[in-house]
Design a protein with these regions (language model features):
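Active-site-proximal beta-strand/loop segments in catalytic clefts of secreted hydrolases
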Residues: 60, 80, 114-117, 183-184, ...
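Autoinhibitory N-terminal propeptides
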Residues: 4-56, 63-102, 110, 123, ...
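Substrate-binding/access-modulating region of protease and related hydrolase catalytic domains
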Residues: 206-286, 300-316, 322-323
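Non-catalytic, beta-strand-enriched accessory regions in extracellular/secretory proteins
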Residues: 286-297
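Conserved small/polar residues in nucleotide/adenosyl-binding loops
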Residues: 1-5, 328-332
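Stable alpha-helical elements in mature extracytoplasmic
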Residues: 33, 37, 61-64, 121, ...
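Subtilisin-like serine protease catalytic core
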Residues: 100-214, 231-232, 301, 312-313
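Surface-exposed beta-strand/loop patches in noncatalytic accessory domains
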Residues: 46-47, 314-331
Length: 332
């Protein structure tokens, strides 16, 4: 059970869904200095990544998560949400084909992607001379390994490129998305993307079909830093979506995106989704006591339930297992 309240923290026994057997990764917001928060986290056996603007990511032993949550220096803690791949747009539907004859082809612009990776050997992502258009690949699946343009060019000259740059795109989703946006180079022009002469940067998420919101935040920070280093205007594409959260901009991921968009030279593009009629959410007014029944399959080890309310009303929630034995009682 996960109860979201703006007062402090959003944690529950379901944090195992975003962890391994010993550690959990969470996003936080704090009004203290990065050095102070880093020291607090290190004292609890964890690692802190500063994202700027008070945001950060903490990797911490599971048994110390409650201690982190009770620190007066931490304003809010949030478990990462899962975001899934989306790519249902086309150039024709977006009226891009009508401007292909113009000179607006993305020259001098860095387009960053947070996705499943990229097939860097594909001719659509090379210049006319065969060199790569990819400035960086940031592979979170390899523990955050960064491959540079020089390394990618070296790999392209090799008979065994993956021995030099081993990052791949297993599902092909990221490659497909980059193709829609940036395909160009040595392919038929009818398959060109929106910005066929732009530079490319890829953040590969550490899951094959979905990403955690903490990975998205790491990726945004990386791409913004690289855009500054290259002194190039930056657009970030995330063809990922989720039905987790309140859908009102209150999650730390949403707040971080809003803050970055308002303060940095960046345009952030996200997938709109195609699930408006899927009925993933339900709303209503609680009158006295409401009982809701649901089934959990025997092969489901973890179930996450998100409930949202306005700030003032008090709500008490009790979760009962078969036999009417109280499992947990929460008040928000």
């Amino acid at each position: 059970m996960c109860i979201r309240d703006r007062s402090k923290v959003n944690i529950s026994n379901n944090f195992l869904a975003a962890s391994n057997d010993t550690e959990v990764e969470v996003s936080i917001i704090s009004g203290s200095s990065p050095e102070e928060i880093s020291q607090i986290v290190e004292n609890l056996g964890g690692k802190y990544t500063d994202l700027g603007y008070g945001y950060g990511i903490v990797l911490i032993p599971i048994e110390n998560l409650t201690a982190l949550a009770t620190s007066p220096k931490i304003q809010y803690i949030e478990l990462p949400k899962s975001l899934y791949t989306n790519d249902y747009e086309s150039n024709r539907a977006s009226c891009i084909t009508q401007i292909n004859s113009s000179n607006l082809k993305g020259q001098g612009v860095l387009i960053g992607f947070i996705d499943t990776g990229i097939d860097y050997t594909h001719p659509a992502f090379r210049n006319a001379d065969g060199t790569t258009r990819i400035e960086y690949i940031y592979d979170l699946d390899q523990g955050g390994k960064v491959y540079t343009k020089e390394q990618i060019n070296e790999a392209l000259k090799s008979s065994d490129p993956y021995s030099i740059v081993s990052s791949t795109d297993v599902t092909g989703h990221g490659t497909h998305v980059v193709g829609i946006a940036c395909a160009g180079g040595n392919i038929d022009t009818k398959y060109y993307g929106v910005a066929p002469e732009s530079s490319i940067a890829m953040v590969k998420v550490a899951r094959s079909r979905f990403a955690l919101s903490t990975q998205i935040m790491r990726g945004i920070k990386f791409l913004i830093d690289k855009g500054k280093e290259l002194n190039m205007p930056l657009a970030i594409n995330m063809s990922l979506s989720t039905n987790d959260g309140a859908h009102n901009g209150s999650s730390l991921l949403e707040q971080y995106i809003s803050t970055v968009s308002a303060t940095q030279r960046v345009t952030i593009v996200i997938a709109a989704g195609n699930e408006g009629e899927a009925a993933h959410h339900v709303g209503g007014t609680l009158e006295d006591i409401n009982e809701v029944y649901f089934n959990i399959s025997s092969d489901e080890s973890i179930v996450v339930i998100n409930l949202y309310k306005s700030l003032l009303p008090d709500v008490s929630i009790e979760l009962l297992c078969p036999g009417a034995v109280s499992y947990t009682h929460l008040r928000a």
